[in-house]
Regions:
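Hydrophobic beta-strand segments of well-ordered beta-sheets in folded domains
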Residues: 2-4, 44-47, 97-99, 113
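Substrate-recognition element of Asp-dependent hydrolases with the DxDx(T/V) motif
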Residues: 39-59
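Active-site neighborhood of HAD-like aspartate-dependent phosphohydrolases
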Residues: 1-41, 45
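Short, active-site-adjacent cap segments at secondary-structure transitions
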Residues: 12-13, 54-56, 106-108
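Generic structural signal for well-ordered secondary structure
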Residues: 28, 51-53, 78
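C-terminal cap/substrate-recognition subdomain and adjoining C-terminal extension
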Residues: 59-163
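Short His-Asn-centered micro-motif
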Residues: 6, 49-52, 101-103
């Protein structure tokens, strides 16, 4: 089984996501469509690792927006997100390949992290990288050092990226 551990803020929404009502939980339809295309290509299951899982309103909103979750990582408030992912994996030995998509690096150093910028959300380049990784075409993840993030943001702005 293939699994994507998904953060939502900064991945399925970004600084450019329209939110005229200033709702606390919002998904950008363009970014969600890109994510759904990734899921269709890979057949991966989605485990929510986002802070949205702590709040019933967040979980409701994820379902309302159509985020296709099968499970959530355990709530370990004194532990980094890395430990929550590893605890979930320990309970699910049938996972052969997984990726973490998160705009932050919460001690995810030794996990396959694909890290979009919160300014752009999930880009097509990162979605392709995740798909290639889950399909075993590469072992390269896409974590971003600060300078890489700056360059990604410049590139996205030059392309007039709209989410």
């Amino acid at each position: 089984m293939k699994v994507i551990f998904l953060d939502i803020d900064g991945v399925l929404n970004c600084a450019k996501t329209p939110n005229p009502r200033k709702l606390p939980y919002i998904v950008d339809p363009k970014l969600l469509k890109r994510f759904e295309t990734l899921l269709d290509r890979t057949g991966a299951e989605v485990v929510l690792s986002s802070t949205w899982r702590y709040d019933p309103a967040g979980l409701f909103s994820a379902k309302h927006w159509g985020v296709p979750l099968v499970d959530v990582t355990p709530d370990m408030p004194t532990q980094p997100r890395r430990n929550e992912v590893l605890a979930w994996l320990k309970e699910h030995p049938d996972v052969d390949r997984y990726a973490v998509i998160d705009d932050e690096d919460d001690e995810l150093d030794d996990l396959p992290l694909f890290q979009p910028s919160a300014k752009t959300g999930l880009t097509s380049e990162i979605a392709t990288g995740v798909a290639d990784y889950l399909e075993g075409k590469t072992d390269r993840d896409m974590r971003c050092a600060r300078i890489t993030r700056v360059l990604q943001n410049i590139y996205a702005s030059l392309r007039q990226h709209e989410g």
